[in-house]
């Protein structure tokens, strides 16, 4: 699905939510099953959904999110031995770790986007999408294990490891297929299509002045700084608490405590981002209802107040164009 992103507010919202979901899964139990010697991941599923709904560029960005999250999570000292090679800070081949954790996930997102792009042009879309979702999990495993065999042969994993499936692998593949099919059905339903047209209606977009944008930017930076300082504070208090109970906190343990706090912060920021986006979507829909209520029922012509607001918006848009 090729998108011209300018003016597609609804698509921005949905992609933002899915990227936030990817970020949450990359840092929480939702994205990993910790079974020695190496964790099994489900965090590739949002990438497949994005590939189905949008395209290779967007799914590659989602792959980048997954890769960066995986690389950060593997940088902790408490992770399993098999997971440590995903971090450039825990191996003697840092470039190889970056290629393994980030490169393979970006490539996976790109390939899935290309596959769904071909499928969306075919006559048998549903069968094609189901098949694409089915091969997503083994394709991700093949890319990751294949890269491990090339970059880190001493790990004992190679492309053959991707064919050793257990119950968890079949369950993840089934969840991936279900997620893609349900997402596609909901996204292209008549209700969502109507809602999308409402959100993307240029007549309903609010004008944001430069001062308003700057104020919002300052507030976001301020809140983020407070959250970051709070993370450091709670990590420090956790160390203090262990000391009170007689547990000696070494430098490595202190690093892992802070590492976990940062993961928690990233997940909470993502959850709040999703909440804000949903509130914006509801607000825009309510503005649409207000807009339709101001229209004359017989003539379908703007009322006086709506017409004046529309003129003000047009003038503001013209001023923005002149300033550019």
Cite the ranges covered by each PLM segment:
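Membrane-interface helix termini and inter-helical loops of multi-pass transporters
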Residues: 32-35, 82-88, 153-161
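Active-site-proximal structural segments of metal-dependent nucleotidyl cyclase/transferase enzymes
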Residues: 310-324
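Hydrophobic transmembrane alpha-helices
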Residues: 1-62
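Residue-level recognition of pore/gate-forming positions within transmembrane alpha-helices
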Residues: 66-67, 137
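Short helix-perturbing small/polar motifs within transmembrane alpha-helices
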Residues: 2-25, 72, 76-148, 180-188, ...
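Conserved nucleotide-binding and Mg2+-coordinating catalytic segments in signaling enzymes
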Residues: 290-312
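Alpha-helical transmembrane segments and their helix-entry boundary regions
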Residues: 58-63, 129, 133
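Alpha-helical transmembrane segments and their cytosolic interface
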Residues: 1-17, 145-245, 256-276, 283-291
